[in-house]
């Protein structure tokens, strides 16, 4: 009994030394509960990400495993090196951009697309090393940042509606309503409303519950075939190490690479600031302890993710759910990472999830991201016009890159045209000029 007590005390002492629990006003029990809470809110990514990357021709079961691995790697690294209650996983939005635009629309092999993700992550790492990252965040206006986030939300929402069959291609009107009497369409719609209703009632696992319910209904209707629940981890060699660095390192993909870098920069940095602020760890300027380590972990995780066959990795805003129940240290993130490792043994479940079960999650994420448009000053046309152009051009041009490009250019046009040149930061001017050069010298040929 004494030995057991000594072992327990030793374990608690180690946790105290590594995570400084008392200093942060928390306990190991609270951190574990927070980890479980965060995990339940974001575990949907292991089912949705393979569905999306499968569109690019990637092995969905292998992607399921690599999604678990990179989520575990990034989250555990964030916990151990930055001691923050922030979990990481492949970014929703950039995975859709990779699959539907870079691979499907542009016709590039997925290996080349992974190369573009790699170079974008390297760019992000260099911005972090040379401390340019926060300079860019501070100097790019809120309207453009909101426009980018909302545009990706509209793009994801459109992909969700398409995957559910709610909208279909129409040569005369571009899109039209699908067959709303089809059971697959109805299940996709049901899945979305399950998420929306449960989320509005503050149920953290809303997305996971929706995927489980719609998959079970699909099984009852004969769309899903039961393949078991637990198995040894399948091989991931069909996707690991297949990144094409040489094929992706060309001027024609400069816009795509820049888009991966810029979106990840805003997404991850914004989430880190938001979650640490909610945890009471950030100051009035948005800076938080071990910020440098957190930014390095974020960048390195994306580089690693491209090598093992998954899309850009980012900090997850769902981490705020763990913070809301008391998570304050990296122990929360480590618990999330360990749970993702356990999920690897549930790979048969990934093969059972039908496309319409994941569609509801896409539409819901689209709603969350598009809601940021409320932050735009709609009374100031020099701010609202660029935000609107950025947001709507992403789904209408079927390209996140073009939406970002037209947003930056239109921002400069509006400020110059109204004589408000002082509102233009060097960062915005440089980015706009880069996109103009891309349009003139690359896109025109």
Where are these regions (language model features)?
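Juxtamembrane transmembrane-helix boundary signature
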Residues: 2, 71-92, 122
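Helix-loop-helix junctions within the multi-pass membrane cores of secondary transporters/permeases
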Residues: 11-45, 49, 70, 91-149, ...
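Loop-to-helix transition at the N-terminal end of transmembrane alpha-helices
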Residues: 56-76
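Transmembrane alpha-helix interface/packing and boundary motifs in multi-pass membrane proteins
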Residues: 74-86, 196-202, 260-267, 298-308, ...
């Amino acid at each position: 009994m004494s030995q057991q007590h000594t072992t327990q005390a030793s374990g608690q002492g180690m946790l105290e030394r590594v995570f400084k629990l008392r200093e942060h006003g928390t306990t190991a029990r609270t951190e574990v509960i927070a980890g479980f809470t965060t995990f339940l809110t974001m575990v949907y990514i292991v089912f949705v990400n393979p569905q999306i990357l499968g569109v690019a021709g990637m092995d969905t079961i292998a992607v399921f495993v690599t999604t678990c691995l990179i989520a575990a790697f990034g989250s555990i690294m964030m916990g151990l090196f930055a001691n923050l209650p922030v979990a990481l996983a492949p970014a929703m939005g950039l995975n859709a951009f990779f699959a539907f635009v870079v691979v499907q629309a542009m016709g590039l092999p997925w290996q080349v697309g992974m190369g573009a993700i790699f170079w974008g992550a390297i760019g992000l790492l260099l911005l972090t090393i040379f401390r340019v990252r926060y300079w860019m965040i501070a100097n790019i206006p809120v309207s453009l940042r909101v426009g980018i986030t909302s545009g990706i939300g509209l793009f994801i929402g459109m992909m969700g509606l398409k995957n559910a069959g709610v909208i279909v291609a129409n040569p005369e009107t571009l899109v039209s309503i699908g067959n709303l009497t089809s059971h697959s369409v109805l299940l996709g719609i049901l899945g979305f409303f399950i998420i929306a209703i449960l989320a509005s009632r503050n149920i953290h696992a809303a997305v996971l519950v929706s995927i489980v319910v719609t998959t079970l209904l699909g099984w009852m209707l004969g769309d899903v075939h039961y393949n078991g629940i637990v198995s040894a981890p399948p091989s991931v060699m069909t996707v690991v190490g297949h990144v094409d660095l040489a094929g992706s390192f060309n001027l024609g993909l400069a816009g795509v690479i820049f888009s991966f870098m810029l979106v990840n920069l805003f997404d991850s940095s914004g989430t880190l600031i938001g979650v640490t602020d909610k945890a009471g760890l950030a100051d009035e300027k948005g800076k938080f302890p071990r910020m440098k380590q957190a930014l390095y972990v974020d960048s390195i995780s994306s580089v690693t993710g491209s090598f093992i066959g998954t899309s850009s990795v980012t900090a997850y805003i769902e981490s705020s759910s763990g913070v809301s129940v008391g998570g304050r240290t990296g122990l929360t993130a480590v618990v999330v990472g360990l749970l993702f490792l356990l999920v690897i043994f549930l790979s048969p479940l990934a093969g059972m999830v039908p496309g319409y079960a994941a569609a509801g999650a896409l539409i819901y994420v689209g709603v969350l991201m598009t809601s940021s448009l409320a932050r735009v000053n709609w009374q100031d046309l020099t701010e609202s016009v660029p935000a609107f152009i950025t947001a709507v051009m992403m789904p209408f041009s079927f390209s996140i890159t073009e939406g970002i490009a037209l947003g930056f250019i239109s921002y400069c046009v509006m400020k110059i045209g109204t004589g408000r040149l002082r509102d233009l930061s060097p960062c915005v001017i440089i980015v706009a000029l880069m996109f103009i050069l891309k349009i003139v010298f690359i896109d025109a040929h």
